[in-house]
């Protein structure tokens, strides 16, 4: 018998201006729409495009809103902060990253679980434009998280439709990238 544990911290490490805010927000909203209490935090040193940015979601069945030390799941999408991001993962936690290129040995930790998703490789045949591939990688990791965490896919696709309502040309490719 499996049981769901709705008490964890997930942090998204991204590059500011990469379109990650939309995907990360959809992740939190999807959990909330499923009736799971969440608290979100943006952590960024600057609003300058290209600099690091983090988005943290605390999932707490008891409704705790404050931050707590450590990260249970790290979605590491920023090469510049990769080492720091891995260091913040609690023992027994998870690292989700794009394994289209092999993970360097200096980033390996024996006390965490690595989940490599070949995001860039998957997007290459789907989207010819490099800028599109860069933007859709965020939606692709959202789809991977939905599968890993048993988030209802209909909730995620509904979030995409809501997010891009009135911009119908964006809905289909975003759902395809999931």
Which ranges hold each PLM region?
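Active-site cofactor/cluster-binding pocket
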Residues: 1-178
């Amino acid at each position: 018998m499996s049981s769901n544990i709705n008490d964890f911290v997930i942090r998204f490490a991204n590059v500011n201006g990469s379109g990650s805010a939309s995907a990360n927000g959809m992740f939190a909203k999807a959990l909330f729409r499923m009736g799971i209490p969440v608290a979100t935090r943006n952590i960024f040193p600057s609003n300058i495009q290209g600099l690091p940015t983090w988005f943290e979601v605390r999932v707490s069945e008891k409704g705790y809103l404050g931050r707590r030390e450590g990260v249970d799941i790290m979605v590491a999408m920023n090469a510049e902060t990769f080492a720091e991001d891995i260091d913040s993962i609690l023992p027994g936690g998870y690292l989700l990253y794009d394994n289209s290129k092999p993970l360097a040995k200096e980033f390996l930790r024996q006390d965490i679980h690595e989940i490599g998703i070949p995001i860039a490789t998957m997007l290459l045949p789907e989207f010819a434009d490099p800028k599109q591939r860069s933007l859709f990688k965020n939606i692709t990791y959202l789809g991977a998280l939905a599968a890993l965490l048993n988030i209802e896919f209909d909730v995620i696709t509904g979030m995409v439709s809501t997010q891009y309502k009135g911009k119908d040309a964006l809905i289909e490719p975003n759902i395809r990238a999931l």
